[in-house]
């Protein structure tokens, strides 16, 4: 089902420093910000390391902004960046990065496993500390207005920022991708929220919005058949009668001769990582297929990992208060 494609996922990624690799005093210093917002922009470039470096550069060494992670995937030809900061500083860095991507990426020459409609495909803002979902919505709308006027880019507001119910789901907006958007954008129900009702000739369109944190989680299967991965994905996602807060699709990893069930867990407190893992394993059995590994793309809330560890270790009455790093950060 097309409306269940995840926002982002990846494999064979070049993963760059994770937060636990930063000195603890650096993290504590950034946590002194009174308001912290997260942004996870997805760019349609996963192969050209020079372009990737240029796109990421606005997030480096900026006051009020911390680059936590970025991973590029060659199969999917996609870059996922995780950055946090004070809302105003974050906003400026994101707008600058979008401008660089619009300049560098030409989707007429882009091919990859991941669905995409724009050079900058999706830009979600997530409230983390001292700010509300309403604050994140306001930031997303301001960024949308500014990139539309500065870069002549059509902008769709999605998720919590959506201007209409049919625009909440990213995959519904993205259906038809860059190629199909040339005609789709002229339909009255698909006029952009900001910017011209004309697809940008090289950069396409962008979805910008506010949402809660999600976990991008992929499970690799020893199945060369993409059909098997598709079938498993259909069964575990919510629309197919599966897990309530799971979006999933099957992906082929040609260079490794395997397939993958790629998921977004949109509320990890209600659809746990371990539950997704076990359900994929359960469904894979009927095909005589087994799990050969899994991965988390980008960053993951500590709570989500603690929950999974507690399940597999059978921990009784375990809480976040028993996690050393969590206590240090208090």
Locate each region found by the language model.
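Composition-driven detection of intrinsically disordered, low-complexity segments
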Residues: 9-12, 26
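Charged/polar low-complexity intrinsically disordered segments
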Residues: 4, 20, 26-29
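Long, contiguous binding/interaction regions
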Residues: 32-330
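Short hydrophobic alpha-helical segments enriched in small aliphatic residues
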Residues: 9-10, 17-19
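Extreme N-terminal basic, low-complexity initiation segments
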Residues: 2-9
